[in-house]
């Protein structure tokens, strides 16, 4: 009997150890399931940014908006292959080579401020390095700094097709950045287009590189009181930068891992249940054997 008792005791101890091992494995499986779900939700809520470049033959004509204030337009011309002819006398300047619209509207942040905007049709032929060259003149200013503000929006045709151009310009001023260029210099702006696609909307942004060259004024001293402004707009390269949010979370991979974890949990639970039943059966058998031994002694 002591030998049988020792065997039963060893079996019980071994079974308890197995149950503890499977409980530990169950805890690991639960932690793995929690970690898998947490990683999936984190990747779902924090998509990664993908950047690609699309090559185009030509761009849609952007809208170039100047806010001249008291300045007036002298000339607007299109040139190609980075070639700008030498400046000519003011009376010989060509004014009507560019397509433009004049819009009067109130600023989006203050209804008291009335703005005058000159909207030009921007260059399109990036392969032939098309550019637009603007010259302006201003003879007086009440501001502390001599500069003219400008902005660029996506499509000039959108403004032409708009039934309310004033409201359109207000929306552009809210959504697009504003830049400036100074008098007495030729500012050369090279534009690039960036399209950003989010979950709910798509935005268009213009990035620019600018270089500034001082204008050598050869006019008579009396005419130099009229300050001249020069600005060039050109596409930098034939590529559109496309920025997209990509969700790297793979639901099928997550589901497969969770299925494996739950199968392991069910197997562990089933084994634990059978082990406990077997321990109870062994315990009852041991008690019955002990009772028979006591009855024989009595």
Curated annotation (Swiss-Prot):
One of its GO terms (cellular component) is chloride channel complex. It is a multi-pass membrane protein. Belongs to the proton-activated chloride channel family. This is Proton-activated chloride channel. It comes from Danio rerio. GO terms for molecular function: pH-gated chloride channel activity. InterPro entries: TMEM206. Residues 1-12, 267-298 are cytoplasmic. One of its GO terms (biological process) is chloride transport. Residues 34-245 are extracellular. The keyword Transmembrane applies.
């Amino acid at each position: 009997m002591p030998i049988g008792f020792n065997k039963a005791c060893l079996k019980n101890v071994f079974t308890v150890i197995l149950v503890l091992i499977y409980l530990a494995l169950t805890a690991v499986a639960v932690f793995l399931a929690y970690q898998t779900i947490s990683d999936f939700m984190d990747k779902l809520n924090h998509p990664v940014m993908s950047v690609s470049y699309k090559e185009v033959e030509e761009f849609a004509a952007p809208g170039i908006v100047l806010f001249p204030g008291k300045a007036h337009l002298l000339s607007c011309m299109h040139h190609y292959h980075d070639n700008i002819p030498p400046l000519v006398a003011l009376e010989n300047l060509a004014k009507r080579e560019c397509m433009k619209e004049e819009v009067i509207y109130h600023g989006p942040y203050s209804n008291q401020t009335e703005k005058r905007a000159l909207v030009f049709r921007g260059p399109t032929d990036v392969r032939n390095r098309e550019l637009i060259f603007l010259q302006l003149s201003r003879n007086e200013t009440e501001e502390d700094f001599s500069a003219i503000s400008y902005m660029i929006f996506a499509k000039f045709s959108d403004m032409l097709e708009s039934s309310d151009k004033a409201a359109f310009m207000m929306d552009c001023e809210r959504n697009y950045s504003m830049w400036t260029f100074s008098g007495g210099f030729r500012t050369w702006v090279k534009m690039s287009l960036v399209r950003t696609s989010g979950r709910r909307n798509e935005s268009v942004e213009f990035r620019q590189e600018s270089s500034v060259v001082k204008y050598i004024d050869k006019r008579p001293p009396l005419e130099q009181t009229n300050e001249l402004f020069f600005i060039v707009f050109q596409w930098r390269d034939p590529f559109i930068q496309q920025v997209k949010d990509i969700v790297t979370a793979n639901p099928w991979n997550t589901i497969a891992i969770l299925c494996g974890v739950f199968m392991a949990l069910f197997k562990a639970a089933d084994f634990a249940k059978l082990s406990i039943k077997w321990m109870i059966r062994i315990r009852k058998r041991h008690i019955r054997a002990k009772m028979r031994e006591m009855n024989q002694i009595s």
